[in-house]
């Protein structure tokens, strides 16, 4: 019984996220080829120059367990000594109401150096709550530019 009480009182963390009033962010990285392409939306972390990297994320209000479509999400890519900010867009629409997430696309530049591309995603909702997603610090799971 004591172990159950301790587990219930311990803070909960989701992929490095803190509780309270901070937004909870989660998502994945995929190929973002056009619809109908065999590799479109296929989970991946190794990309070649010229390939489309897709970021799919969600931001949840911990108090309600729901997302606010007006929340703004931004992918922050760090590579080749610079940071690129990619605003995300809400993917949900009338024809596809089940797509309750945000997306951003980045084409790997032709001059991108081989190796790991670090990224984070930040979010801010209309009420001022914020959140941040950082992938696990495991090199094999990072976005990697390959030959």
Locate each region found by the language model:
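Short beta-strand elements
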Residues: 129-147
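Extracellular Ig-like/FN3 beta-sandwich strand-entry sites
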Residues: 50-52, 114-118
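Hydrophobic beta-strand positions in extracellular immunoglobulin-like domains
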Residues: 59, 106-108, 123
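Aromatic sugar-binding surface patches on proteins
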Residues: 94-106, 113-115
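Short, solvent-exposed loop/turn segments at the edges of extracellular beta-sandwich modules
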Residues: 63, 126-130
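Short flexible loop/turn segments that cap and initiate beta-strands
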Residues: 59-87
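Short, compositionally biased P/S/T/A/G/V-rich stretches that sit at domain boundaries
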Residues: 14-54, 59-62, 143-147
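Bacterial N-terminal signal peptides
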Residues: 1-10
């Amino acid at each position: 019984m004591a172990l159950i009480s301790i587990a219930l009182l311990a803070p909960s963390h989701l992929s490095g996220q803190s509780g309270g009033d901070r937004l909870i962010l989660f998502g994945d990285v995929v190929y973002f080829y056009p619809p109908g392409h065999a590799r479109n939306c296929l989970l991946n972390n190794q990309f070649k120059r010229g390939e489309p990297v897709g970021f799919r994320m969600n931001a949840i209000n911990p108090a309600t367990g729901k997302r606010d479509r007006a929340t703004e999400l931004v992918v922050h890519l760090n590579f080749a000594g610079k940071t690129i900010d990619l605003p995300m867009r809400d993917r949900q629409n009338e024809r596809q109401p089940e797509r309750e997430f945000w997306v951003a696309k980045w084409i790997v530049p032709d001059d991108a150096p081989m190796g790991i591309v670090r990224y984070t995603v930040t979010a801010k909702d209309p009420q001022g709550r914020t959140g941040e997603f950082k992938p696990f610090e495991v090199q094999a799971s990072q976005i990697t530019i390959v030959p």
